[in-house]
Amino acid sequence: MAAELGVPVQFRIKHTRHAYLIGNILDLGPLGIEIPIVEEEATVDEALEAFYYPQVGRRSWGGAARYGIEGRDDRLAYADWWNRTGILCLQMESVRAVTTVHKLAKPGVDCLTWGPNDLLYDLEAHPEHPFKTVDDCVRYALKQLEGADAKISFRNYSPDQRNKYIDMGVTVLMESPRP
């Protein structure tokens, strides 16, 4: 239905350990994939392999519903187009992810998305950690990623928080729809 309307879809996989299935999910038509609770470089490596076609990754060829395939009959041309167009996102939902953000934001990772509520659970579990707030974590990550290609996406939920995060350096905001 989204494809019929020309609306790109981003899909959040169900679990971090399902990163190996990204290629199969992308064959169904989403433009982007979001992986929850990423903390390990190995997860990022697995995601990159499954997301990108050779010679960047190892994604296999297939799926008539793939995003952007219509009108792109040449295998190499489509793979090149996809490797430049698809959107790979990692969710930053723990203090561990934040403190290793420079290792997780590898080339090919387009966006680091913030689940502030899950990150709050982890901050509450580590009350002695120097990061006390989600905003502390966002500021730290932005500093660590200066000059990197990966962008930070934040779920600010309402427009009244928009300027605060833009001023911090966040470039992608997710807000709840207005009634």
Show where each model-derived region lies.
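Hydrophobic faces of well-ordered beta-strands that scaffold small-molecule active sites
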Residues: 9-13, 33-35, 88-92, 112-114, ...
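Alpha-helix-loop-beta-strand connector modules within alpha/beta enzyme cores
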Residues: 1-18, 23, 27, 49-61, ...
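Conserved anion-binding
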Residues: 20, 28-107, 116-118
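Short, charged, surface-exposed secondary-structure boundary motifs
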Residues: 42-46, 122-124, 179
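Short beta->alpha connector loops
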Residues: 15-17, 93-97, 157-159
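Glycine-rich, proline-tolerant flexible connector loops at the mouths of alpha/beta enzymes
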Residues: 114-133
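Non-catalytic positions within long, well-ordered alpha-helices that form the structural scaffold/packing
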Residues: 26, 105, 163-167
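Short, electropositive alpha-helical surface patch
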Residues: 162-178
